[in-house]
């Protein structure tokens, strides 16, 4: 699983999925962009999962 994310290619293990999410940090008053490979991932608020090769999780801005 290859995911182009933040100008770099992230390779995950075959049994893993690539997850990226937007986490709001109240004490810093801005959104932190987190991403990584995980064997478990949920599609929830601000969180997406990359399940196909070479999918782009990076959003503009």
From Swiss-Prot:
Its main location: secreted. Disulfide bonds join 3-19, 12-37, 41-49, 50-55. GO terms for molecular function: toxin activity. GO terms for cellular component: extracellular region. SUPFAM superfamilies: Snake toxin-like. InterPro entries: Snake_3FTx, Snake_toxin-like_sf, Toxin_cobra-type. Keywords: Disulfide bond, Secreted, Toxin. It is found in: Secreted. It holds the Pfam family Toxin_cobra-type. Transmembrane segments: none annotated. Expressed by the venom gland. Belongs to the three-finger toxin family. Short-chain subfamily. Orphan group XX sub-subfamily. This is Weak toxin CM-2a. It comes from Naja annulifera.
């Amino acid at each position: 699983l290859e995911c182009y994310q933040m100008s770099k290619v992230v390779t995950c293990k075959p049994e893993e999925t690539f997850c990226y999410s937007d986490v709001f940090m109240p004490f810093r008053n801005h959104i932190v962009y987190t991403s990584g490979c995980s064997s478990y991932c949920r599609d929830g608020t601000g969180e997406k999962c990359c399940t196909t090769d070479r999918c782009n999780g990076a959003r503009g801005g």
